[in-house]
Amino acid sequence: MRFNELNENKMWYKTIPQILEWLESKSKMPWIWLDTETTGLGGPKQQQLTQVSAIATQYDFKNNNFSEIGTFDEKIKLTDETKSKFDEPENKTKWVLGFNHYGSGDYKYKNESDIVDDFFKWIDNYSPNILVAQNAGFDMAMLSGRYGHKITNEVFDTKMLIQLYLLPLLQALAETDTKYKEMIDFIGTSGRDNGLISSSMAKIGPVLGINMTGYHDAITDCRITIQMYQKIVELLRNNQEVDIMKYQAERIKVIRESK
């Protein structure tokens, strides 16, 4: 996959003030928050997109506020290949569609290739920009891999902010404050995080006090991701003196070993 992903190495081994400075340096251009829904997690050769959504924003870093300057939200017709899977024993496509609210809302369902083309034309309206997503690699693989579009934009994965900054901060604070220990216990661990504290938005959102109603609808998830990011930045700003290096290094070691 070819896109200029903001590789996690660029976010490794920074202090809290350094990561805040890095985020501020990116705040002059539009931030486009995006999410996709698909028929499964098998990737662009096995699954199709069912929803592509994004919110273009201007970032007021000083006040940690985002102003919406545009939205993209489209649902996609099921391909014949997808429909043919419905009758396969053990196939979970129908369950996934229900999980992702497919069929709900006042949408005109359109062809997948047209929507992907339209999406890339739409983001060009805000160039240069930075694309922001939770677990960005998956969405970028689907958007670029289905019809061969190249993603040249900078990409920022909020999952990296969680893994390398939020969670290490909570761990450091938990050493002396039971409130943060309770937050960590609520989040729990995850196999997807190689047994470390989960970086899933489904766990991080609620512990930060975010209303998750409508979660797994792409446009809703964009808004939840914005709120989650704002809460994380607020926590980081309020704890800039905390040394997170021990816990960050532990996470980086596991990320390296899992590659």
Predicted segments with their positions:
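Acidic two-metal-ion nuclease catalytic site recognized across multiple nuclease folds
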Residues: 2-22, 180-192, 207, 219, ...
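Conserved non-catalytic scaffold segment of RNase H-like nuclease domains
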Residues: 6, 10-144, 152, 195-198, ...
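Catalytic phosphate/metal-binding cores of nucleic-acid and nucleotide-processing enzymes, i.e., regions
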Residues: 38-49, 59, 64, 145, ...
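Active-site catalytic pocket residues across diverse enzymes, especially alpha/beta-hydrolases
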Residues: 58, 147, 232-236
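Short alpha-helix plus adjacent loop in nuclease-associated cores
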Residues: 158-193
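Short acidic, glycine/serine/threonine-rich helix-capping segments at coil-helix boundaries
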Residues: 211-218
